[in-house]
Amino acid sequence: MAADLPEATVQNILDQESLKWVFVGGKGGVGKTTCSSILAICLASVRSSVLIISTDPAHNLSDAFQQRFTKSPTLVQGFSNLFAMEVDPTVETDDMAGTDGMDGLFSDLANAIPGIDEAMSFAEMLKLVQTMDYATIVFDTAPTGHTLRLLQFPATLEKGLSKLMSLKSRFGGLMTQMSRMFGMEDEFGEDALLGRLEGLKDVIEQVNRQFKDPDMTTFVCVCIPEFLSLYETERLVQELAKFEIDTHNIIINQVLYDDEDVESKLLRARMRMQQKYLDQFYMLYDDFNITKLPLLPEEVTGVEALKAFSHKFLTPYHPTTSRSNVEELERKVHTLRLQLKTAEEELERVKSG
């Protein structure tokens, strides 16, 4: 079934010039970082500037490009308009807390609201990014569960803001009095955390609007043709719909293509299994752009390897057709050699006459 359907590419993403935010996510171990890196490379060929951000604590982006990245945008070697950065999705509590006896109180307040630390960290990062002039920003996200929490950050921060407003109205100047007791009035007051959240409010509202705008934001799901990955992809697509975040591209990675030369029973069995799930992907997501990528015998690391693999994102991969073309050319060469040999023998007979 899947083999009969036309192959899609990620060209539609490159053609959508209004896109500002591109998220790449999926189950762990499916090749998200490789796909997000190559997608950023493809976008850099048609955009004035591209920034790729890793929000995965594992930070595989440096490994993919074989270049050290930090929490500040760094120019990727070999490019003039592609930048990369790796950020910690959890807030640095040392930056948030006071000193001496107050840091425990501050931490308790921050931790009292589930997810507030990650949400504030992500909002601060977006606030920084928005001050920079990048045409498109690609997110290499953590596995599905972390990604969904990340996408909830606007609601989490709004909830945190309302809770702290409620605390302020109920307890008045209690926190200010406590800060005076510790001699920290200048460093910590009742409005410290509240002020920080309010400072992010405009960013939250603006980004939330942009994330829900299909002209500005899209989510690319990366998966492999196996049951658990199919399940995670469906869960992700359903959750994205709840968040009103556009998604219309799926990349199916590590596909084994049918090859007449394959004799291994194990590979044949894996091909049959993959084909079953490929059919299900095409049935479930018949209105999506589905890009299939082959399983390679080696890892794709380093700029040159990423660039070499990038053409498979824009041109459907057809190994059978390629093999047939090569075999046809080889047959033609063999025939011409035979004809040349026959002609040379005929020429020798004529000469010896």
Swiss-Prot record:
Its EC number is 3.6.-.-. It comes from the Eukaryota. It is an enzyme of class 3 (hydrolase). It holds the Pfam family ArsA_ATPase. Transmembrane segments: none annotated. CDD domains: ArsA. ATP binds at residues 27-34, 226, 253. It is found in: Cytoplasm, Cytosol; Cytoplasm; Endoplasmic reticulum. Keywords: ATP-binding, Coiled coil, Cytoplasm, Endoplasmic reticulum, Hydrolase, Nucleotide-binding, Transport. GO terms for biological process: protein insertion into ER membrane; root hair elongation. Residues 320-353 form a coiled coil. The keyword Transmembrane helix does not apply. One of its GO terms (molecular function) is ATP hydrolysis activity. Disruption phenotype: Strong reduction of root hair length. It catalyses: ATP + H2O = ADP + phosphate + H(+). GO terms for cellular component: cytosol; extracellular region; GET complex. InterPro entries: Anion-transp_ATPase-like_dom, ATPase_ArsA/GET3, ATPase_ArsA/GET3_euk, P-loop_NTPase. The active site is at residue 56. Homodimer. Interacts with GET1 and GET4. ATPase required for the post-translational delivery of tail-anchored (TA) proteins to the endoplasmic reticulum. Recognizes and selectively binds the transmembrane domain of TA proteins in the cytosol. This complex then targets to the endoplasmic reticulum by membrane-bound receptors, where the tail-anchored protein is released for insertion. This process is regulated by ATP binding and hydrolysis. ATP binding drives the homodimer towards the closed dimer state, facilitating recognition of newly synthesized TA membrane proteins. ATP hydrolysis is required for insertion. Belongs to the arsA ATPase family. This is ATPase GET3A. It comes from Arabidopsis thaliana.
